[in-house]
């Protein structure tokens, strides 16, 4: 990537039928802090509402279509169900990013420029291992949104992508994103043994990649996910201080909790089922 291009991971966007209902659910169990009020946006892909929240040092964005005006959010939900829609990365200069992607045969969609000097473009999930990725050129790149002071309640650790070929996926992100820092090399999961995982820091944020191991294994959840949905974003992962209290509230409220266990290293975790969490599989680890 051009040395003059700088990037910063900004948020993961979640497509929902109702922002208010989704925010009510996530706020009940996780320490969300509003970054932006619910706002209407008009882009080349259509008009919609969005709202941002801080969670453990990272940002969740919720998006919905305008009432009675089905658009790209509704089309996404009709095809995939509610859930993670795209990853968003801020850049100081968009044009060289798009030029390199197109030169290498990547599919770039929904380009748009705004009077403010901002601009946006997306890498089609067909080119980026099932993940729709937004680049957002911001004129005030050197003056990012101030983060709230750490509250010690949560740490947003990573987004996990299910892929067929983990090395090809990691090579792709290393080629088109910056800065990139190596993380854990692909290896058989020590805690489970039924999937391969690796991670890397991409534009200041950790991405995890998971892949089925060679041969047939019991409980190959990665293969099942890809068979049903295709490659793409699998889950979000966070460390939570009030692990026990949150788990108790979820169960008391009848929210489906799955894969609750302690791994071989003594680390406790559970997942909030996407059936109750607006299509998002949420992994929760004990402690910060």
Q: What spans do the regions from the language model cover?
A:
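Vicinal oxygen chelate
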Residues: 1-3, 53, 59-61, 95-152, ...
């Amino acid at each position: 990537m051009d040395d003059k291009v700088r990037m910063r991971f900004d948020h993961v966007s979640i497509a929902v039928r109702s922002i208010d209902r989704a925010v009510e659910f996530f706020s009940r169990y996780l320490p969300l802090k509003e970054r932006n009020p619910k706002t209407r946006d008009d882009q080349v892909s259509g008009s919609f509402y969005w709202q941002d929240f801080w969670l453990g040092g990272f940002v969740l964005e919720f998006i919905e279509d305008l009432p009675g005006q089905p658009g790209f959010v509704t089309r996404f939900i009709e095809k995939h169900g509610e859930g993670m829609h795209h990853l968003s990365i801020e850049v100081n200069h968009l044009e060289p990013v798009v030029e390199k992607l197109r030169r290498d045969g990547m599919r770039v969609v929904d380009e748009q420029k705004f009077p403010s000097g901002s601009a946006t473009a997306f890498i089609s999930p067909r080119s980026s291992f099932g993940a729709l990725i937004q680049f957002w050129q911001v004129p005030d790149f050197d003056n990012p949104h101030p983060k709230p002071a750490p509250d010690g309640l949560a740490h947003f650790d990573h987004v996990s992508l299910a892929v067929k070929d983990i090395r090809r996926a990691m090579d792709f992100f290393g080629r088109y994103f910056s800065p990139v820092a190596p993380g854990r090399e692909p290896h058989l999961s020590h805690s489970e043994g039924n999937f391969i995982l690796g991670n890397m820091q991409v534009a200041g944020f950790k991405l995890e990649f998971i892949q089925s191991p060679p041969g047939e294994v019991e409980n190959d959840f990665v293969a099942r996910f890809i068979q049903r949905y295709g490659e793409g974003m699998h889950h979000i992962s966070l460390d939570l201080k009030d692990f026990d209290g949150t788990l108790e509230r979820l169960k008391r409220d009848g929210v489906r909790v799955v894969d609750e266990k302690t791994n071989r290293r003594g680390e406790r975790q559970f997942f909030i089922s996407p059936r109750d969490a607006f299509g998002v599989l949420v992994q929760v680890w004990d402690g910060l």
